[in-house]
Amino acid sequence: MLNKDSARVIALKAICLVALEKRSLSESLFPIHGDDLSFAKSLAFGSIRFYHHLNDIITPRIKKPLEKKNLDLHCLLVLGAYQIIYTDISKHAAINETVEVAKIIDKPWATGFINAVLRGIDREQKVIIESKHFSHPSWLIKKIKKDYPEDYENILTENNRKAPLSIRVHPSIDRDEFQKELEELNIH
């Protein structure tokens, strides 16, 4: 059962702060702890990271523009679409839980709308994934395309790739010993 402190509700608030109020994601407060905190941050950071791609998917599926007071529903659709397209969360659970968030934020009238848009995205997921997208603002795509006409697609694609994790070992720690410890923990 979701409540106002659930991971998805917290993630929605963070997404709204960034998308609607132009605040930084690091300014967003995550007032929960443990696994819920990790899940909320994962949803918020992922939704923001792929915001432009998700926005391009959602916008044509909304027949009438949302009123300013209901733009949080657009953010909720971004959150739901992110779960469907970019995570291994069950599609049914992603849609159902996103619809439940609409009730928690006092917009039960929007549940059918949220459900319909997300089910449409789920049905077309294969086409969406196979289509070319860069998840960058259009002004940046134009600039990179102008400056690097031969390589812009590779540049934008690589820029979307998740950065590898690097670990720096303090000089006072034996590097080989530390590497053994990581291997024992099955971290490679």
Predicted features, each with a name:
Residues M1-H188:
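Class I Rossmann-like S-adenosyl-L-methionine
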